[in-house]
Amino acid sequence: MKLEDTTILITGGSRGLGLALAEASAKTGARVALVARDRTELDAAVARIRAAGGHAHGIVADVGDKRAIHRIAGEAAAVLGPIDVLVNNASTLGPTPLRLLLDTECEDLERVLEVNLVGPFRLTRVIAGSMALRDRGVVINISSDAAVEAYPSWGAYSIAKAALDHLTRIWAAELVGTGVRVISVDPGEMNTRMHAEAIPGADPATLGDPVRVAAQIIAMLRDPETAASGTRQVAASWEVPR
């Protein structure tokens, strides 16, 4: 897929992997829409991309709020053009320190599901139709190794990510023949604020670099043969793009 002059919408785009991917996307010549809740962080991210010569637009919104979904998709398309790539990256751990399921409030589980699962479903549902009409598009759902491992105290997050992986497979099966690919990406443990909140004592030197993972995702987008629709891609197993 040629990324120059495409529109890429990235949720959770103001920091971590989302920001790294937004910067990498802009460097390819893509127009990038970043979605985040914090206006200050979002404005700083957009300014950083523009200062480097990229084309970026920020949208302050919470993907866990169903009232924001149509506004996100509509504003991104109105300002930057039809969306070619959707990256469902926004995520929440729930309350930290992380809790065992016995200590997890139903409301906290509901919030994690709204952001990590229902939000991606809603955005994909709004955007994938227009992608199919143009016979092209990619949806990337950012997953986690917690989706396939039973880590104590990661229950709410793990449940949401496991469901997101299966949602990816169902979307892919239902969109066969439309030109739209839907892929899960497990980026692995990365040196991000979110990881530090989950595991405060982790050694940053042992964690992955969001910039490297972003470069790998860009390489995957450029070459559709590297990731079939409906697959779960694990960043740790990818070769480093040159």
Q: Where would I find each of the regions flagged by the language model?
A:
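The beta1-alpha1 cofactor-binding region of Rossmann-like NAD(H)/NADP(H)-dependent oxidoreductases
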Residues: 39-40, 60-72, 106
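Alpha-helical segment proximal to the catalytic Tyr-Lys
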Residues: 129, 172-174
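Residue(s) in the substrate-gating loop at a strand-loop-helix junction
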Residues: 144
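Substrate-binding pocket helix/loop in short-chain dehydrogenase/reductase
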Residues: 97-101, 105-110
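Conserved glycine-rich cofactor-binding loop
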Residues: 12-15
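Active-site helix of classical SDR
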Residues: 124, 160
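C-terminal helical subdomain
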Residues: 177-180, 184-185, 192, 200-242
